[in-house]
Every structure is written in structure tokens, then in C-alpha cells.
Amino acid sequence: MDRPALLAVPALVLAALTVPLRGLVAFEAARAAISPVVLLSLLSRVLWTLTAAVGFAAVGYVYGRRGGRAPSARVFGVAAVSAFFGAAVGGVLFSFGAAVTAPGGPTVKYVFTGLYAALDGLLFGLLVVGGYAPTLTPAR
């Protein structure tokens, strides 16, 4: 398995676990019926924050090596930017969506929870793209 595939597999596994679990928070029926799943959903926010703060930078550093040379600045940059925006923007969206209590609030809450889940998927995709970028060599 080449380096991009090794990068893509853990990113896809984390995305497959995190994105659907977070989406369950938006549904009141799931809250009432399946409390352990809701607990996992809430814990997925912690998982996402840890992954963004530590995982992106670490994976970018490890997989950013090219031919035994120093880590690629491009991959490390993608990892750092993903970590910052993932934690900051995701936290703001989640807090805003959870704080909505006005009439029509559930709809807004569903929209923002969905946006947060989409942000998760987008940033995991960005991580995978960042892993592929340094492995592409221009044709000569």
C-alpha cells in the first residue's frame, strides 16, 4: 500500500465514524430512544477536536516525507490549517446550533448540525488531498 492509501484509510475510517454520529444529535427521537448512541454522538465532538488539534498535524508530518528528505511544508501546512479551522469553525457552528431556542429553532439546529457534519467530511477530504499532493511529480 502506498503512502496516499495509508493516509486515506485512517482518514476515511474516522470520517465514517464521526460524521454520522454527530448527525444523530439533531434528532430528538434518537435522543429519547437511544441514549448510548447520543452519548457517542456527543463524544464524537471531543474525538473531532482531538483529531483536528493533534491528528492532522501528526499525520501531515509523518506522511509529508518525500524520499527520506525533510517533511513537506505543503502537507504540514494543510494539516495545520485543517486543525485550526476544524476546531474553531466547527466549535462555533456547533455552539450556535445547540443554543437556538427561538420558534423555528429545531430547523436552524438541524441545518447547523448538518453543516458541521459536512465540515468534518470536507476537512477529512482536505487531509487526504494534502497527503496526495507531495506524491505527485510533474511530467518531464
Predicted feature residues:
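Alpha-helical transmembrane segments of multi-pass integral membrane proteins
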Residues: 9-22, 82-90, 124
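Canonical alpha-helical transmembrane segments
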Residues: 49-68
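C-terminal halves and exits of single transmembrane alpha-helices
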Residues: 75-102
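Juxtamembrane "helix-exit" motif on the non-cytosolic side of transmembrane helices
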Residues: 23-32, 93-104
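Transmembrane alpha-helix entry/boundary detector in multi-pass membrane proteins
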Residues: 4-8, 28-52, 110-120
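Alpha-helical membrane-associated segments of multi-pass integral membrane proteins
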Residues: 4-11, 99-140
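Haloarchaeal acidic low-complexity proteome signature biased toward cell-envelope/secretome components but also
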Residues: 1-20, 35, 65-78, 130-140
